[in-house]
Amino acid sequence: NGRVDMVMNSGKALCLFELKLNKSAEAAMNQINLKDYPARFALTNLPIIKIGINFDTTTHTIEDWKIER
């Protein structure tokens, strides 16, 4: 099953974040889509923004990110 890593409600949209370490933003986005995280928030009637972020533990920075609306 799994859970989305972070949810942010701006009042105008719901942002679903999946965070990865030393993988890829694409892997994070794939998890959001494969586990159908947006369906869990359908009753909010807010637009869903999916955000996948990959962190690099060597440089301690965001390596890449991907956003889908």
Predicted regions located by residue number:
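C-terminal structured domain segments across diverse proteins
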Residues: 17, 31, 49-51
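Domain-level recognition of nuclease-like catalytic cores that cleave nucleotide substrates
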Residues: 40, 46-69
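Intrinsically disordered, low-complexity acidic/polar segments
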Residues: 15, 26-28, 44, 59-62
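Mg2+/Mn2+-dependent nuclease catalytic core
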Residues: 21-38
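Conserved catalytic cores of phosphodiester-cleaving nucleases, focusing on short active-site segments
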Residues: 6-21, 35
